[in-house]
Amino acid sequence: MDKHKVKRQRLDRICDGIRPPILNGPMPVRPLVALLDGRDCTIEMPILKDVATVAFCDAQSTQEIHEKVLSEAVGALMYHTITLSREDLEKFKALRIIIKIGSGYDNIDIKSAAELGIAVCNIPSASVEETADSTLCHILNLYRRVTWLHQAMREGNRPASVEQIREVAGGAARIRGETLGIIGLGRIGQAVALRAKAFNFTVIFYDPYLADGVERSLGLQRMATLQELLMHSDCITLHCNLNEHNHHLINDFTIKQMRQGCFLVNTARGGLVDEKALAQALKDGRIRGAALDVHESEPFSFSQGPLKDAPNLICTPHTAWYSEHASIEAREEAAKEIRRAIAGPIPDSLRNCVNKDYLLAAVQWSGMEQAAVHPELNGASSYRFPPGVVGVTSAGHPSAIEGLVASSHPLIPSVSHTPSPGQTTKPDPDREIPTDQ
């Protein structure tokens, strides 16, 4: 028998054996797909309207999601502003597929999802150009101190002499000949490397999962260990997904391995950096300056936390990924992945299933019934409302978004809500970072 067919049948048994199949019948019986942490479904609706009912929840936690969605939704779209732990996932009774709009998925317990029969997908191509551009902006800002010079001008400090210029612009440095160290050479890491070379950086990288030879094709130098990269870099930029192996990758110990006066940039995941250790290093001058787009606790505030008094620090609110074009592109791809899931089978029909291996390991085959299962994803709970975009109100009634669905229910105005990027962790050309440092 074809080994690929056997493998697909095994995955079908996992998904269909743990949870019932999705019913995709004629109106009004259509599967329910819910946008968990947003309200704007105007991009997703044209792609899904003929196969599903699309609801929005605008929730920041599962406690804010109505029971109707928890009990009937078979598909979920989500950004980075909500977290799904095992406890959260267990509240969904019919869920079969989760799409993270963006590449990072550390806010989802993908192993527990697999054990519950839920496939998790991401959009690994989302916002690569935007994140790389933002990373270079942060790097240039640290070297040329644009933020601090602008702030001085706003405060009325207009230098009139060379001595005053030296005082205000102190710390500005020449880029040519500096060494940029990249941790994680996936899509975004490579895009950053190519941009940095144009600014005459010498670019080195550390990525234990990258195939040999990529460095030669890109004209980069590969470091064998993380310590070697830290010791040779004048500026370090992180492009790693967050997992149990690299949490607080930048900590007191690794900071002491860096060059004195090194710069640090993080546009990947906040948990990669121990902010307490970073704050102390900035105060001591061991790290000359840092630029963070992501933080351990978000939304970030300068008024609290270990970084509140740290000098030479630039912070932006997890927006390095954003452009209108990138947002639309990611949302379209997420909706198409949901559509593929409805057509089935799961997970073979999916392009970017990040917990496929966990799905395969979720069930002991010796104890499973060997009867054939339906190969298509035609099933889970049906939704009694007709296809369209609905918002589930506090009373549990569906409400249409104006201009999308004809309805006698009160209209809820749509508010734009956009996705978050990140990086993937699969050990293949599509993954964004080393999963084990």
UniProtKB/Swiss-Prot annotation:
It is found in: Nucleus. InterPro entries: CtBP, CTBP_dehydrogenase, D-isomer_2_OHA_DH_cat_dom, D-isomer_DH_CS, D-isomer_DH_CS1, D-isomer_DH_NAD-bd, NAD(P)-bd_dom_sf. One of its GO terms (biological process) is Wnt signaling pathway. Its main location: nucleus. The active site is at 269, 298, 318 (proton donor). Residues 410-437 are annotated as: Disordered. It comes from the Eukaryota. Keywords: Nucleus, Oxidoreductase, Repressor, Transcription, Transcription regulation, Wnt signaling pathway. Residues 415-426 have a biased composition (Polar residues). Interacts with the C-terminus of tcf7l1-a via the consensus motifs P-X-[DNS]-L-[STVA]. Corepressor targeting diverse transcription regulators. This is C-terminal-binding protein 2.
